[in-house]
């Protein structure tokens, strides 16, 4: 497996371009299955999960053309196979997203239960109950979800008992072609959900209320072609801002959406960063200062994203003072703590709370990535450590960060990838 070798102690300085958001790209690629005409999607990040979903579409007989700039044209009318097989689905939980659009457009779907991250339980029950409420017959046998409907799905009022991003997206896609109106209550409000709604509306859908906790979908008989650019990745943006902050540096992130990062920027200002924003850029300057410890609690958007928790923990490792981090979204999401402590961190975990006491200096060590955001946090910690850190199992990083070592090198980091 590839490794990253990082020599810490360099102050980051420079400008980088932010990639398209993986968490918007995946549902949008799934939603191409709803259209009766070819659709084009641009600004896709060049990531393993995106490639896997494109491969899944191709395996099902969907006509996919991709250029060297990651613009994809998809024509779902050529679909031959309504099954998403285990060997592709096992690596990525987002593959469950093809269930809603397939049953809505083609009347049936068979999707293997997904794999992906190792963090906690992510039940798909909400997706299945919602589809049943819209008239689908659902059977789970031998690890596959088999869904079918006679005619069209029917609009329904669906109250989700917990806020779920993929659940909201799956049901929103299914409802786009249903007969009648669907109301999704307790819906996820994430910008990626809004981007998916914008994409469906560009194809002729009638979705309103995306970005609030009640989404209204008036079903239409067919969806047509369109061109759509995926929104910028707010988590990638936040990760690079923290990487600059931990080194006392300066960074300008370009082609991003500052309005999607209010909770993150507020905490960075608390840590002592000077933040300036424009329409599509954010500049952070630590002016060589050591960060101050911050306390935070993860919660659904627009609050602090769980996907930024590990990165803020890394910042706290070398900060002045003590910060407390409470994880409310996923269980078992402190797997990076053990690895950070190998670098000389002082972290104590009590249930879903981590208490981080800042130390003067971290020391480079061999560490192992356990999930996507944990691996990014280990890279951030390594940038501030003295000596050399080796981060193993970085296939986790490659699932969510496009060219991470190249972007960090352009900011002055000493980092290289060593192939297995």
Swiss-Prot record:
Q: Where does phosphoenolpyruvate bind?
A: 22-23
What's this chain's function? Cell wall formation. Adds enolpyruvyl to UDP-N-acetylglucosamine.
Q: Name one Pfam family in it.
A: EPSP_synthase
Tell me what reaction this enzyme catalyses.
phosphoenolpyruvate + UDP-N-acetyl-alpha-D-glucosamine = UDP-N-acetyl-3-O-(1-carboxyvinyl)-alpha-D-glucosamine + phosphate
Q: Which UniProt keywords apply?
A: Cell cycle, Cell division, Cell shape, Cell wall biogenesis/degradation, Cytoplasm, Peptidoglycan synthesis, Pyruvate, Transferase
One of the record's GO cellular component terms = cytoplasm
GO BP of this protein = cell division; cell wall organization; peptidoglycan biosynthetic process; regulation of cell shape; UDP-N-acetylgalactosamine biosynthetic process
Q: In the UniProt record, does the keyword Cytoplasm occur?
A: yes
> What protein is this chain from?
UDP-N-acetylglucosamine 1-carboxyvinyltransferase
The active site lies at 117
Enzyme type, top EC level? transferase
- Gene Ontology molecular function, alphabetical: UDP-N-acetylglucosamine 1-carboxyvinyltransferase activity
Q: In which pathway is this protein known to take part?
A: Cell wall biogenesis; peptidoglycan biosynthesis
Q: Binding of UDP-N-acetyl-alpha-D-glucosamine: at which residues? A: 93, 307, 329
2-(S-cysteinyl)pyruvic acid O-phosphothioketal modification sites? 117
HAMAP family the record matches: MurA
**Top-rank taxon, per record:** Bacteria
Q: What subcellular compartments does it reside in? A: Cytoplasm
Say which species the protein is native to.
Alcanivorax borkumensis (strain ATCC 700651 / DSM 11573 / NCIMB 13689 / SK2)
EC number of the protein: 2.5.1.7
| Assigned protein family | Belongs to the EPSP synthase family. MurA subfamily.
């Amino acid at each position: 497996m590839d490794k990253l070798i990082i020599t810490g102690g360099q102050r980051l300085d420079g400008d980088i371009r932010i990639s398209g958001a993986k968490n918007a790209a995946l549902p949008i690629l799934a939603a191409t299955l709803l259209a009766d005409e070819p659709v084009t999607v641009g600004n896709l990040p060049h990531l393993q999960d995106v490639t896997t979903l494109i491969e899944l579409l191709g395996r099902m007989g969907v006509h996919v053309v991709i250029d060297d700039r990651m613009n994809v044209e998809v024509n779902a009318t050529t679909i031959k196979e309504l099954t998403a097989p285990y060997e592709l689905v096992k690596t990525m939980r987002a593959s469950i997203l093809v269930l809603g659009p397939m049953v809505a457009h083609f009347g049936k779907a068979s999707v293997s239960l997904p794999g992906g991250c190792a963090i906690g339980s992510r039940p798909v029950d909400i997706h299945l109950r919602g589809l049943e409420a819209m008239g689908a017959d659902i059977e789970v046998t031998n690890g596959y979800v088999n869904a079918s409907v006679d005619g069209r799905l029917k609009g329904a009022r669906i109250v989700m008992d917990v806020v779920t991003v993929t659940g909201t997206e799956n049901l929103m896609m299914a409802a786009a072609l249903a007969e009648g109106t669907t109301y999704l209550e307790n819906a996820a409000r994430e910008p990626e959900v809004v981007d998916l709604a914008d994409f469906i509306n560009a194809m002729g859908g009638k979705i309103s209320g995306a970005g609030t906790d009640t989404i209204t979908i008036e079903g239409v008989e067919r969806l047509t072609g369109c061109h759509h650019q995926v929104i910028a990745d707010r988590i990638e943006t936040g990760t690079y801002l923290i990487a600059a902050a931990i080194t006392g540096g300066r960074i300008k992130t370009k082609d991003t959406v500052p309005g999607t990062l209010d909770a993150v920027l507020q905490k960075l200002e608390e840590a002592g960063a000077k933040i300036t924003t424009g329409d599509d850029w954010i500049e952070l300057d630590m002016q060589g200062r050591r960060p101050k410890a911050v306390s935070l609690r993860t919660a659904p958007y627009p609050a602090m994203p769980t996907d930024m928790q590990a990165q803020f923990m890394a910042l706290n490792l070398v900060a002045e003072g003590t910060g407390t981090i409470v994880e409310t979204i996923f269980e078992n999401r402190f797997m990076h703590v053990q690895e950070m402590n190998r670098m000389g961190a002082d972290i104590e975990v009590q249930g879903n709370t981590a208490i981080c006491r800042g130390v003067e200096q971290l020391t480079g060590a061999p560490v192992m990535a356990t999930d996507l955001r944990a691996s990014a946090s280990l890279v951030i910690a390594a940038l501030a450590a003295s000596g050399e850190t080796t981060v193993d199992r970085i296939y986790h990083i490659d699932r969510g960060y496009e060219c991470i070592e190249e972007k960090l090198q352009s900011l002055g980091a000493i980092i290289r990838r060593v192939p297995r």
